[in-house]
């Protein structure tokens, strides 16, 4: 009898517990149904925010730091075609050293500074061997006039060193650069590319040459042909450098009024021809020449001085800066 009573009490206890649990569950469900829709929506938003915050924390802790983007590749320069494949030149430098051929570089000891620059630009057949302490030893780009090609060929073992990966840009009038077999300079370049297939040789197109003429007219107000002017290799080199470089450090270029000073020092026109003509004598004779064609060195330097007021151009050996302009110049590099 006692055993039956204990068994009955146990069953009642179990039933009571189950009923209580069911009532609690029913009450919870009922309370959710009775909540206004706004409260239900707020609860869902709180749950989503909590989940998002948790996920964000995990994402920050597990994700790597963002990587730096790779620098932009070399930009394509229009108007400069490969002699062998006729493909356009692709090149870009943040910092450039434009090394002139001036006698002002003698005993300057600027060579180490020049060689530390990302890209070093030289002109024509200006050598480095024997002058490294003053002009440096590296060459990234060499701009060469058609009249200097023969001298380049004679000194090809020194000047056409393909181990440095130097880029060579040749310029000349269309009669010398024509491709129909009658262009003397172009024929020499074709032969050169066959002898040195690894040479990075480029030529300025005829259309680009006309644009260089137009740029000279825009900057000076003078028509090149009417004024019997031959653009110098320095004109081509400075303009190419503006296309190629973000910053240009020019070594050996005097300001345009340098030769007007009667006390100016006498230096050779070329640092590698110490017994050659005086620099200012050469500049003044070409600037004043009227018969025949001449380089207008001083006129070109006035343009370079104006460009330096706006663009990232700096002059060393001698060191000088252009005075502040009286009027604001339009931003943007010279365009063709």
Swiss-Prot record:
Residues 30-336 are lumenal. Residues 38-49 have a biased composition (Low complexity). It is a single-pass type II membrane protein. Keywords: Disulfide bond, Glycoprotein, Glycosyltransferase, Golgi apparatus, Lipid metabolism, Membrane, Sialic acid, Signal-anchor, Transferase, Transmembrane, Transmembrane helix. Residues 34-76 are annotated as: Disordered. Pathway: Glycolipid biosynthesis. Residues 1-8 are cytoplasmic. Glycans are attached at residues 137, 161. It comes from the Eukaryota. Pfam families: Glyco_transf_29. High expression in forebrain and to a lesser extent in cerebellum. No expression in salivary gland, intestine, liver, kidney, heart, lung, thymus and spleen. Its main location: Golgi. The keyword Membrane applies. One of its GO terms (cellular component) is Golgi membrane. GO terms for molecular function: alpha-N-acetylgalactosaminide alpha-2,6-sialyltransferase activity; sialyltransferase activity. One of its GO terms (biological process) is glycosphingolipid biosynthetic process. Residues 50-66 have a biased composition (Polar residues). Predominantly catalyzes the biosynthesis of ganglioside GD1alpha from GM1b in the brain, by transferring the sialyl group (N-acetyl-alpha-neuraminyl or NeuAc) from CMP-NeuAc to the GalNAc residue on the NeuAc-alpha-2,3-Gal-beta-1,3-GalNAc sequence of GM1b. GD1alpha is a critical molecule in the communication and interaction between neuronal cells and their supportive cells, particularly in brain tissues, and functions as an adhesion molecule in the process of metastasis. Belongs to the glycosyltransferase 29 family. This is Alpha-N-acetylgalactosaminide alpha-2,6-sialyltransferase 5.
């Amino acid at each position: 009898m006692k055993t039956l009573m204990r068994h009955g009490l146990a069953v009642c206890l179990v039933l009571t517990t189950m009923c209580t649990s069911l009532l609690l569950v029913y009450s919870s469900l009922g309370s959710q149904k009775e909540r206004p829709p706004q409260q239900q929506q707020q609860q869902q938003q709180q749950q989503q925010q909590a989940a998002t915050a948790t996920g964000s924390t995990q994402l920050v802790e597990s994700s790597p730091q963002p990587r730096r983007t790779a620098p932009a590749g070399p930009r394509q320069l229009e108007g400069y075609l490969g002699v062998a494949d006729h493909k356009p030149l692709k090149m870009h430098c943040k910092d450039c050293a434009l090394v002139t051929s001036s006698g002002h570089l003698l005993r300057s000891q600027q060579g180490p500074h020049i060689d530390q620059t990302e890209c070093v630009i030289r002109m024509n057949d200006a050598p480095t061997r024997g002058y490294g302490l003053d002009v440096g030893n590296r060459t990234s780009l060499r701009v060469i006039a058609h009249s200097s090609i023969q001298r380049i060929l004679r000194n090809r073992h020194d000047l056409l060193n393909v181990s440095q990966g130097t880029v060579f840009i040749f310029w000349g009038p269309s009669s010398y650069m024509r491709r129909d077999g009658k262009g003397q300079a172009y024929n020499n370049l074709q032969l050169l590319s066959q002898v040195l297939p690894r040479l990075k040789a480029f030529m300025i197109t005829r259309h680009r040459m006309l644009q260089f003429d137009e740029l000279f007219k825009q900057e000076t107000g003078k028509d090149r042909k009417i004024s019997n002017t031959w653009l110098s290799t320095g004109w081509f080199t400075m303009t190419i450098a503006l296309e190629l470089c973000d910053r240009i450090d020019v070594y050996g270029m005097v300001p345009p009024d340098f030769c007007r000073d009667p006390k100016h020092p006498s230096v050779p026109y070329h640092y590698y021809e110490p017994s050659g003509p005086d620099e200012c004598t050469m500049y003044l004779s070409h600037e004043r020449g009227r018969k025949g064609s001449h380089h207008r060195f001083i006129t070109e330097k006035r343009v370079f001085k104006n460009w330096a007021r706006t663009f990232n151009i700096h002059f060393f050996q001698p060191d000088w800066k252009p005075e502040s302009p009286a009027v604001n110049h339009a931003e943007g590099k010279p365009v063709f």
